[in-house]
Amino acid sequence: MVSHLIFTDFYSKKFQKMKYSSDSEDNKKETIYTYYFTEQEKYAKIYGSKTLVFIQIGKFYEAYCTRKKGYVNLAELEPLLNIKFIRRDDKPIKDGKPPKPNQFGINCVAISKNLSIMVNHGYTVVLFDQKSDGETIERECVGVYSPGTYLSDIQMQEANYLLSVYISEEKQLTCNKNLMAIGLSLVDISTGTNIIHEFYSNKFDERFGLDELVRMMQTFRPVESVIYYHPVNIDESAIKNVKLYLELDKYHNVHFYIYHNNKGEDALNLLTENSFKINFQNDYLAQIYEMNNQLTLNKKQSPLEILGLERRNYAAVSLMMMLKYIAEHNVLLLKNLSYPEIYLYNKHLILGNNAIEQLNVIDSNNLELYNSKISSVFDVINKTSTPMGKRFLKDNLLNPLSQENKKEIIKRYDYIEALIQGNIFKEIKTELKNIYDIERLHRRMAVGAIVPYEFTRLDNYYKATNRVYSVIKDNDVIKSIIPMNIFKEFVEYQVKYNKEFDTEKMANHANFGEISESFFRKGIHEDLDKIQEKIDYIQSLIKSTNYYFTSIIKDKCKKLGNKEILSMESNDREGYYFTISKSNEKILKQEIDKKKGIIKIDLTIGETLDIKKDDIVFKQLPKGRTKVFMAQLAEYTIKLPSLTEKLTELIKKKFIKSMVTYYSNHKSMLHQITRFVSEIDFLVSGAIVAKEYYYCKPSILSENSIPSYLQAKDLRHVIVERLCDETVYVPNDIELGNVPNIIHTKNKKDSSIEEVSIDETDKFKKVLGKKCNGIVLFSNNWAGKSTCMKSVGIAIILAQIGYYVPATEFNYEPYMALYARITGNDNIFKGLSSFALEMTELDAILMRTEKQGSNTLVIGDEVCKGTEDISGRAIVASALVSLSECDSTFIFSSHLHDIQNIDEVKSLNNLRVYHLRTEYDEENDCIIFDRKLMPGSGPSVYGLLVARYLVKNPKFINRAEIIKKRLTNDINVNLIPKKSNYNKDLLVKQCMICRYIPTTEYHKELESHHIHFQKNCWTDGKIKEKPYLSKNKLYNLVVLCRKCHNKVHQGEIIINGYTDTTIGPLLDYNMDIKKKIINGIKAVDDLEKSFKFSNNKSQIQKTKNTTVKKIQTSKKNNLVCEYA
């Protein structure tokens, strides 16, 4: 029977016992050490070198090591767990005996917390518990815990995936090649989520299988992986190359094995001949997924067919491996496991070639940012309140919906729009804050691991969920997120368990320690009620007796501090008794003597207890106390511990059974409730982001599947615009693909893309409004081309998870695939040179765009920069032609200006060329970045422009610096600059127009001025003209003296804002030329006065003429802003 294979066999192998009888302490210790090292060695061979065995010794779990035995690096746990490591092997040998092993112990009460820490740091932990019958002590293995198979009671927000992969190398008959067929299974033990996927290479795309496996690993980021490679022939070099290609060094806890000649190399035997046999698979899966009843009803379907695996042989093998791996750790985790969800390749936007990392979607480690709070797109748009919502958002970012899920995408836009209207999202957000991880608590219900206190919390989360539903139930759009009949069942489920449990009493039980009061309601379980009645009677005896004797003496006794006059104590032999101080003992005896033969005590339950006063015994105790013993009381109370133990055991058994039953009976409904909370949290986050950051609702015009395109107005980069504090982010208009004429007609009047002369664009045969599949973008470094290109890819991802995008208008048709090849992301793990890797990835991209090119977006940054000029131009030109011919949409950046003169490129009528303009500012010795897309290729020798800024002659610079200081009247005054009232990062130090600096001799007040006047801003601080900008950010503030400030408000000076340059933001303003010359001559006269001690009159005149000339011809006055 499979049940025997899974359950009985597991326990017989894993729960091995060790017995020893009473003996000398030294002999027992020697036995323990020998046993420990045997088990440590055995389990390390099975689970790997990072395996730790802990055995229970009394109240501690202990581990041992010497320099050669056990886990020799045991001392590394000391800083990790903050527990002392006891070193013993450095002590001298005594009586010919070696020193005892080093020791590390964890208190039993703290094992759960420390186990979680060890597992999260990649250890596999094996626990042995201690049991005793009084004569012998037994120790047995109670669990094996690894990162992917540990069901923690500590709530985690991230997914916790275990990955199982079967890679089979298949020999081909039609060609002399071996191709990869791969089956993949994923499970999150903490939630029960189960995913399977199967894919293959083909003779035209041999690397597809491994590339797809890499993509899945990058997407789901498993905490533990088991990979079996089944090659045709054993070739160590080929095996090494596979491991390098999969970049396994980037992941933790990877177990890589080889299967060959019907034999695997792992100690667990995860893959055997039986794993490939259909009958064995059906029996095994029927047992795991409890399909026996279903099989009776569906005699025509096997378990493989029910699970959709009948045509997915490789996925079935990977699933078998994973289930066996879980069983070898903790078989109970297989209980109530969800049916595997088949990953449908065409239902998700394929983020190929590691686009997730290259576009900084999630937790990027290649984005050079100094703001640790924002390192990815996820950091910007995550406004979720619950762990489920957070996981739902992250899962969608990693697996956006594809064109085939267009209806769902549009539905999400409508949901967010409805949430924004009337600010409904704010009310829902308030309730979502009261909900934590329902999904993981449901999983703990499913496996019977939940404790009473957790169910109380779950009940509170349900109540908050009810309140969320009450907010949306009358909204015709949002209420469709969850069917009404599902929520009706949810309410009925709550009514049902509240009839069974008193959830308030549950809150007192964080575990199944001693329970003296049942939280099951009376009448539910007769056996519990009977035990509870006995316990209640005994507790009434204790309480009433204490109250009676205290009441007859309390007015005459001395009470010491907060101590009770009569203290209740107990022991196993005598049950409960009272203790009293010696001084109060006399008073109590006197009061008892006044009573007649029988003392009648009224109990709280309405009965009476008769106590003979002669049966009350006083016995002296140490420390000035006296024991007051009553036989009638002891007769009952001595039974209390055993009754409490029996009650606790019964409650635990019945509670776990109820939990598993509730979950099994309402499994589908509970799953949909979890989905409802996750999705509404996800949508509320989208509404908050759209409202707060002024994102726009994307528009999908066609209901049918058509070639993909995008048309964005004022598109911004999600991350970069949030980091722009000193200068305004410059948005751009982007158009790719065959944009419908209706959009061009709509935007014809207000299109911000500059018209281009026929001569300039003739070679590309392109006119605005016609089909444009691709863009080639030229610019020098730092100009923002990567930011511009990434903004397109990120906007598509946001749009295809159903979120609004950072633009003022965004029209598009969803894509099926997005590939990125961006500079600075070379990966040496694959064992290829930078250029070889680039060509390998380019080859894969071009090959995969051929199949669905019209629905593919490709982003390539500086392709072929790793080779010489002629080859580079030829490769880039050929790539542009290939992508254009298959109708894919793409943006390529390049430094190779000559490609536009290649005949094949000239002939492309669906390609457009742009550049990002930069200028060199001689006066300020800096490069000014325009950041705006301009038609045409721009200057081809901009490298010289950069060189003028970067290449310095020290002697020349020093001399220029001296002259510059004289010309700008740079007076050094040791005054502490003030900070602006509007923004503490702005130093009020110098007028940014006339460059006046306050002095102690003559002081004019400096003021902070809003470039966009405050009267032109909304009450929430947003600028009316540009609502995505805030009035008190540095980009909208300028320091002015009173004189210049008045000129600004009189219109004599017009401030345009700041321009981004290599030396920081520079102020751009215009003023009346005549007034400017007059002011300039006055400045020169002041300068001449400052040279009154100089004899070099020719130098003074030369400086004067130069300054006036500059003032006359300049349209900008650029002064670097100074910030705190």
Swiss-Prot record:
PROSITE patterns found in the cross-reference section: DNA_MISMATCH_REPAIR_2 (PS00486)
SUPFAM superfamilies the record matches: DNA repair protein MutS, domain I (SSF55271), DNA repair protein MutS, domain II (SSF53150), DNA repair protein MutS, domain III (SSF48334), P-loop containing nucleoside triphosphate hydrolases (SSF52540)
GO BP term (any one): mismatch repair
Gene Ontology MF, one: ATP-dependent DNA damage sensor activity
Binding site for ATP: 779-786
One Pfam family from the record: MutS_V
SMART domains (alphabetical): MUTSac (SM00534), MUTSd (SM00533)
Keyword annotations of the record: ATP-binding, DNA damage, DNA repair, DNA-binding, Nucleotide-binding
Family: Belongs to the DNA mismatch repair MutS family.
Biological role stated in the UniProt entry: May be involved in DNA-mismatch repair.
Protein name per its UniProtKB record: Putative DNA mismatch repair protein mutS homolog L359
Lineage summary: Viruses, Varidnaviria, Bamfordvirae, Nucleocytoviricota, Megaviricetes
